[in-house]
């Protein structure tokens, strides 16, 4: 816990090596000394070919449910990541961007499509890839109320 306690802030990027021991250390450290906690990936799970991985959103929700202060989110669907990307494109091109000409392609309604819709760019849902593959897409859209501008099968 000493290494955790030495940190001024935390950035939660991924869970490849994360386990319950690290989770307990982080919780104890943030409980005894609250400080900024950034989360770049609010996904709870991520689909892989043969399994689902548990992602930072899952562990962050556990912390919230255990009384840890709300984190600072900056991954999809939160606007910060989209604003950073748009600023980068404007910087590289040297011109302003017509938002109606930008599209976010993604495979998840709750992050990719919701984020694109909330920032005002076109949303393009891949239906045969990722979390929604083998799902009834129309039913998923109806259930969530998150409506993409376009549907494509995949890459």
List PLM regions with ranges.
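Asp-based, Mg2+/Mn2+-dependent phosphohydrolase catalytic module
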Residues: 1-155
């Amino acid at each position: 816990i000493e290494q955790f306690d030495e940190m001024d802030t935390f950035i939660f990027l991924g869970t490849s090596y994360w386990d319950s021991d690290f989770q307990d250390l982080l919780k104890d450290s943030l409980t005894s000394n609250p400080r900024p906690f950034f989360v770049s990936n609010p996904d709870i799970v991520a689909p892989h070919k043969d399994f689902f991985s548990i992602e930072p959103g899952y562990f962050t929700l556990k912390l919230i449910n255990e009384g840890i202060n709300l984190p600072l989110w900056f991954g999809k669907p939160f606007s910060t990541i989209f604003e950073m990307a748009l600023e980068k494109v404007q910087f590289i091109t040297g011109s302003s961007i017509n938002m109606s000409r930008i599209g976010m392609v993604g495979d998840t309604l709750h992050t990719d499509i919701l984020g694109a819709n909330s920032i005002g760019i076109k949303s393009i849902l891949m239906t045969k890839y990722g979390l929604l593959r083998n799902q009834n897409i129309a039913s998923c859209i109806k259930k969530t109320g998150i409506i993409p501008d376009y549907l494509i099968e995949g890459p």
